[in-house]
UniProtKB/Swiss-Prot annotation:
UniProt source species: Arabidopsis thaliana (Mouse-ear cress)
Any Pfam family: SRF-TF
GO molecular function: DNA-binding transcription factor activity; protein dimerization activity; RNA polymerase II transcription regulatory region sequence-specific DNA binding
UniProt GO BP: abscission; cell differentiation; floral organ senescence; leaf senescence; positive regulation of transcription by RNA polymerase II; regulation of flower development
InterPro entries: MADS-box/MEF2_TF (IPR050142), MEF2-like_N (IPR033896), TF_Kbox (IPR002487), TF_MADSbox (IPR002100), TF_MADSbox_sf (IPR036879)
Function: MADS-box transcription factor that acts with AGL71 and AGL72 in the control of flowering time. Promotes flowering at the shoot apical and axillary meristems. Seems to act through a gibberellin-dependent pathway. Interacts genetically with SOC1 and its expression is directly regulated by SOC1. Plays a role in controlling flower organ senescence and abscission by repressing ethylene responses and regulating the expression of BOP2 and IDA.
Location in the cell: Nucleus
Entry keyword Transcription: yes
Gene Ontology CC entries for this record: nucleus
MADS-box domain ranges (all copies): 1-61
Record-given protein name: MADS-box protein AGL42
Amino acid sequence: MVRGKIEMKKIENATSRQVTFSKRRNGLLKKAYELSVLCDAQLSLIIFSQRGRLYEFSSSDMQKTIERYRKYTKDHETSNHDSQIHLQQLKQEASHMITKIELLEFHKRKLLGQGIASCSLEELQEIDSQLQRSLGKVRERKAQLFKEQLEKLKAKEKQLLEENVKLHQKNVINPWRGSSTDQQQEKYKVIDLNLEVETDLFIGLPNRNC
């Protein structure tokens, strides 16, 4: 016979409610014991009946388990609190950063001449002063770059002049010094002339007087 599904609501009959409590309590205590043994779990179970009677089970010392639970929840709450504070700080920093960006964009548009129709004379004078300061910095940087480039060109010119002087000095010391290839070619020409002379001397038969 199939057991009917029990509706999950308070049992109105006191006797039936007490019988159900006893059965479910014993089953719950048994399951808690099995869980602690099979899974080596630290487990504590506290039950108060409707009349205020205490039923409890603990795989170890009940007080130690409660202290461990309190410490865990306290640390967890502290960690959550710190996280909330850090998150709030990040939100404030992001809000300040957005405000700064908007202010910079506003000043940028003013410096570009956008939206200045509503500016007062003092505001326009301040914008003009900022532009003059910016223009002065640009010119100063431009002059510095020109100076650095000129110094590099002068250094390059000095290097080329020194190399030219060294080459001139070498030519003065050895004005007739040629390359090794030219010297070898001249040597071979002399040898060839000598060979031609010697060949001319031995060609032909000696003259005999008849």
